[in-house]
């Protein structure tokens, strides 16, 4: 009896492995066949970029493609978002895969045949519009993934929800409610989802490489505003003033001690940056007020609470000691992008299978942020980085994201198609 059980177990494992191998081969072949189409999609989106909640052309192309693949399609989610649902031929979990669609108010400098042709008025200034963060590639890659998995529909053990999201970069006002992922969650896109996957292309990581990190991967973001109120006076009679410029300067220096003296940086980093100071209109007038704005980056709620408290203490006490007052506003924006440790561990073999073990790198915490974190607050998620730097590139000098010279090596896109497709299939097989 025991021998029979062992034999059946070995037979099951062999059959499972053969099935997995067959599906992997189908994914690889279909992705390779689609490579040029994915590149063409990306070039089209790159030439016709659209800002947050204005992605109507992009969304229309996506929705038409999803319908052509026989999916249930919902448009107008969170303003311009598109959801496509592919129901597999066998019962199982629902896996979500997300791509963001929006571009940035950046004037492109690259001399490409598919260079951006779009300009706009943004916050009162004329500017170009550019896919300067690679979201054009994200959309094209996920369209490729949809086609790969649609061709395997009858063999899928569960359902796939394709999320094409607007406004990852936020809107002009950068309000806490302007992030596309937050709006999508509020409209219920995660209610029937068991796990979610996403990727971000990286222009300073070699094409062919995938980066990952379990736990806190990208920072939480808070917006900081400090208004220092003093007493206005003639610049020739400073003793008559309570100078908010001097006070603001002392506050800026005082804030530098938070990370260097209050945060245990050997465990995890943190950032407090003052990005702008506005005060005064004339060389010989000490103003009444000075406004400072900045950003806070943290990786845990306890770290976030500590930094918020110290900002209020330092700014408030320095202002009070000068006879001034400080009005402090801290708005929570993105949560931490937190890769579920169990999900990450279970999917690591998939990443290594797809890219090769030598090409799967563990990355340090990233001080940038992603609204993918809103999905991860609802369900387990894994967010990876996909290399997009040419082989001859140097990660120290390659043009970074959000710049006019941002550039991607398109040869890395097919790995993104294979990786997201395989993650979805393997998750469904394991769950």
Language-model region placement:
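Soluble non-cytosolic domains of exported or imported proteins
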Residues: 32-36, 49-60, 132, 136, ...
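Hydrophobic beta-strand positions in extracellular immunoglobulin-like domains
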Residues: 86, 228-230, 296
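Divalent metal-coordination and catalytic microenvironments
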Residues: 45, 84, 97, 135, ...
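Histidine/acidic-residue-rich, glycine-tolerant segments that coordinate divalent metal ions
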Residues: 119-130, 136-137, 148-267, 271-276, ...
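Hydrophobic h-region of N-terminal signal peptides that target proteins for export
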Residues: 10-18, 34
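Acidic/His- and Gly-rich active-site-bordering loop/insert found
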Residues: 20-130, 140-157
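Sec-dependent signal peptide recognition
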Residues: 2-9
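Metal-dependent amide/peptide-bond hydrolase catalytic core
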Residues: 20, 68, 246-431
